[in-house]
């Protein structure tokens, strides 16, 4: 039985240790190996609750992603072939408000001063503004997730899949009408 010795550190330079581990993972293709060595095993599929790419990542994202990564690594240690699917949340009021501010328009101007198609095109571009920063964070924190083929919530395939699933839930009687208090923004005209 062979013995392996862990590297000993005299001083605690966590940034240096992190760089060394990331380099070792890159050299050994560790993330890919964690998948290929489990071909044929039971699968566990993880869809990341996607971050919004139109905002910069913060410490709360690091904390949430750490928990997500722990779950996936735990399932990997249990012998599962873990598929980790990244995604981008591209819907929402912050995207629209940011584009309107950048263009100097209001909701009422959409369809008159700017076509709906042009507005949507600009929103799609702007929502992906910080993807490079997110991808750097993903790598630097050692978060293992497949960023090569993310699901994107503005993609028609994604939207049609949700419509299909909602229709299936409706057919099975699993949707119901209810009443809740909703936040309202007078400035954005939402509610």
Q: Where are each of the predicted segments found?
A:
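N-terminal, positively charged nucleic-acid-binding surface of large information/translation enzymes
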Residues: 2-191
């Amino acid at each position: 039985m062979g013995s392996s010795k862990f590297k000993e550190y005299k001083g605690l330079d966590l940034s240096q240790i992190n760089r060394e581990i990331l380099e070792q993972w890159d050299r050994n293709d560790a993330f890919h190996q964690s998948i290929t060595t489990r071909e044929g095993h039971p699968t566990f599929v993880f869809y990341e609750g996607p971050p919004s790419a139109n905002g910069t990542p913060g410490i709360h994202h690091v904390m949430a992603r750490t928990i997500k990564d722990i779950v996936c690594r735990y399932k990997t240690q249990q012998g599962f072939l873990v598929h980790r699917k990244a995604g981008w949340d591209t819907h929402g009021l912050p995207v629209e408000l940011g584009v309107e501010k950048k263009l100097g328009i209001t909701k009422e101007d959409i369809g008159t001063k700017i076509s709906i198609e042009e507005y949507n095109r600009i929103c799609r571009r702007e929502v992906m503004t910080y993807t490079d920063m997110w991808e750097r964070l993903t790598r630097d924190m050692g978060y293992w997730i497949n960023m090569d083929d993310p699901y994107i919530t503005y993609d028609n395939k994604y939207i049609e899949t949700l419509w299909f699933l909602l229709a299936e839930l409706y057919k099975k009687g699993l949707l119901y009408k209810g009443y809740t208090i909703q936040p309202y923004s007078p400035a954005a005209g939402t509610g």
